Each structure stands twice: as structure tokens, then as C-alpha cells.
């Protein structure tokens, strides 16, 4: 759902009007509207820009060949025989292309050799040709964390980081946007020495109260109904959009969603051994009277809660908070149940 993200859009558009220098990591709580924002960003790009958009969640990625399949989109298979044809295909695509067109024989070689640097070298060549033709390439990778542990003669993620550094800080060839909802991944990135001075961080958060209420009222909810929804879901875009479908049973639906989330967390909690269970409960008590708490390091209980999308770890400010208001309410109910 895209609504009232003009400030974020303006920042992104201003960023791509300058020379590429830094990798931009776009992050935030789960379902905060990051992908919707990037899709709208692509639509608003000036005509002399073209975005190569790759969603790594589109298909399961468990091997290098899976990664190549997503990188070099199947929609271009058997359509391209030369680099010139690949460039022409990109230039005719408008502002966006899903993946990179690649000559068939070269793709077979890239897949067989299992050397990421060969795939990246081709992408650089393609982008250089696109640039010569008067277009400014932009690379957007959505959900990069899904390949975080994939090994191809070493960690693929580090090969990618080096590639991104080359595209931005070294060659100034392309802006690079990496989108993720995984706060453990962004914490890892934020602490990565090789990215110091080579990356910036762009937070896409849930809507503020004023924005959420305006969206709900614009879609026909009364003041009281909008307040009810805010009290259950805060500014989480996905729930605000779903609310419109359930207006005839609004209170019941909101309560049902809270019961479901509470039950899901309890199922996970009750499966823990006693020591970790007690640590998690103690962590939950930190949110009994406040919505965010500082953290020094990612302890066992924090890792458990973040991996299960109960809590969101914000590495820049080093604070923990529930993934959304629904999780905050569920935590409070759980504390009432287990006391």
C-alpha cells in the first residue's frame, strides 16, 4: 500500500540526482511499506533513469544457480543473443526492468562456472553501455537477506557487497538500493567493517498517527472507527489496508487479529526451555510501560524475539521495539496470562 510517502520519495529522488557514492540500505519494521515505496519511486524516476529491480523472494534461493535465475530474469531467456540486443531490450523497457537480459550462451557459461565475479562483470558492462546510450542505471535488490548464508567459493553476500562498492564508491556507475525487513541482517550490515564509509541507511517506518488516521478516514471510517484501528494496529500499512474490508465487524476483527497474534507468540514461547523462557519473559516486561528500550548487544533472548518478528532492532539508534502495535498489545496480554 502506498500512501503519503512524499517526504521519503523526495529524499530518494534527490539522492539519485547526485553522483553514486554510497550503497543505500532501505530498512524498517516488517510490512512497513518498503517495497511499495520503491515501486512508487521507480514510477517517479526522471525519464533518463532506468531501474534494474530484483526481488530475491520471488523464488526460493538455495544455490548459486537459483541466484542466477533471479538475477537474469526468465522473461528474457532465449530473447537475447548479443550484448547489443540486451542493451536494446533494456532501453525499450521504460523506467524498469525485472532482472538483467543476458545473451543465452553467456548465461550458460556464468551458470556452469559458478563464479559470481563473471556475472557481475557482465552487469557492469551492460550498465556501462546503457549509460553510454544516455540512461542512468539504478540497481534495486529487494530482500537481500535471503542469500545471507549462501556459499559460492566463499560467502556470496560479501561478493555482492564488493560489487556494490564498485558500482557506487569506485566507479560511480549506478546507485544501489538494498531493501530488507530483517533487522538482524541490517544489524550485521551496520557492523560490517568493509561497509564503513560506504553505506547509508534509509528507515521506512510505520505511519505516524496523523497519517494513519487520515488514511482510514479517507477510506470512509468514522473518527471513532479510525481511533479503534489505530489502538490495535498503530500505523502498520498492511493492517490499515485490510481494515477497510472488515468495517462491518471492525471491533470483532481487530480483537480476533490480536488474539491470533497473541496465540502465535505463546506457541513459540511455550516451546522454549525454562532458562530461555524466563529471559524472554523478562525482556517482554521491559515493554510493559514503554514502547522502546535501548540495547547494547543482541543477546540470546533478543535474537529469539527479533527472528520471530516480535521485536524490531534498530541498529542506528540501538533501540528495540515491537514490530508493530499489535505485537506490543500481544506482549502485554502474554504478561497478564503468565503472571
UniProtKB/Swiss-Prot annotation:
Q: List UniProt keywords, sorted A-Z.
A: ATP-binding, Nucleotide-binding
Entries under SUPFAM superfamilies matching the protein:
P-loop containing nucleoside triphosphate hydrolases
UniProt-listed InterPro entries:
AAA+_ATPase, Archaeal_ATPase_domain, ATPase_dom, MJ1010-like_2nd, P-loop_NTPase, WH-like_DNA-bd_sf
Q: Where does ATP bind?
A: 28-35
- Pfam families noted in UniProt: ATPase_2, MJ1010-like_2nd
Molecular function GO labels? ATP binding; ATP hydrolysis activity
Family to which this protein belongs:
Belongs to the archaeal ATPase family.
Question: Can you say what this protein is called?
Answer: Uncharacterized ATP-binding protein PYRAB09480
Species of origin? Pyrococcus abyssi (strain GE5 / Orsay)
Taxonomic lineage per UniProt? Archaea, Methanobacteriati, Methanobacteriota, Thermococci, Thermococcales
